[in-house]
Amino acid sequence: MSEDNFDDEFDGSLPSGPRHPMARRFRGYLPVVVDVETGGFNSATDALLEIAATTVGMDEKGFLFPEHTYFFRIEPFEGANIEPAALEFTGIKLDHPLRMAVQEEAALTEIFRGIRKALKANGCKRAILVGHNSSFDLGFLNAAVARTGIKRNPFHPFSSFDTATLAGLAYGQTVLAKACQAAGMEFDNREAHSARYDTEKTAELFCGIVNRWKEMGGWMDDDD
């Protein structure tokens, strides 16, 4: 299915009257940055262990900024596979007494509720996932939505913005830490592979790239 066909089938509609600048910027889509930490690479069989989502706002001059972050540690679904190498890579300790993990459905319900509020505030019809190697995050998000049976998923099911690609274009770097450093951002490798930290850094990187493009005259609001 093409994106245009998906738009035709979408059951929401944009508000009448003047459109919010954010809605004009991305054709009615609201960028929401997502990062997941998992028990492996297979979204169908491997556990979702952490998820974070950062909504993106726009100031009065049309520049983007990271707005609000939602973060949850997740209880592995029943029968989930967890590779020891994945835990070693992320540093996640499933038996940590302060982990305070929740079920997938509870986490997604809360995140989606916040995203729907952001959609309404920005006059947007749908969220579009932003991620570093975004197909990975979108795959795990879609798998969790399917497992939980959640019907009101605000995200486009297959379109996304990939900051690995954008950073390769803008800075010649595709690794998140190196891309952030090339963009003049601080990046603490000790904090990396936490869904919250990686999401917030990816959001900062995405906003910086989009804002830099605007400053170069690459996008002008038709209503400016």
From Swiss-Prot:
GO terms for cellular component: cytosol. GO terms for molecular function: 3'-5' exonuclease activity; magnesium ion binding; nucleic acid binding; RNA exonuclease activity, producing 5'-phosphomonoesters. It holds the Pfam family RNase_T. Its cofactor is Mg(2+). The record marks F41, F89, F136, F158 as: Important for substrate binding and specificity. GO terms for biological process: DNA replication proofreading; tRNA processing. It is an enzyme of class 3 (hydrolase). Keywords: Exonuclease, Hydrolase, Magnesium, Metal-binding, Nuclease, tRNA processing. SUPFAM superfamilies: Ribonuclease H-like (SSF53098). Mg(2+) 1 binds at D35. It comes from the Bacteria. Binds two Mg(2+) per subunit. The active form of the enzyme binds two Mg(2+) ions in its active site. The first Mg(2+) forms only one salt bridge with the protein. The keyword Magnesium applies. SMART domains: EXOIII. Residues 32-206 form the Exonuclease domain. Its EC number is 3.1.13.-. Mg(2+) 2 binds at D35, E37, H193, D198. Homodimer. Member of the DEDD group of RNAses that are characterized by the presence of four acidic residues in the active site. These residues are conserved even when the proteins have highly divergent sequences. Trims short 3' overhangs of a variety of RNA species, leaving a one or two nucleotide 3' overhang. Responsible for the end-turnover of tRNA: specifically removes the terminal AMP residue from uncharged tRNA (tRNA-C-C-A). Also appears to be involved in tRNA biosynthesis. Belongs to the RNase T family. This is Ribonuclease T.
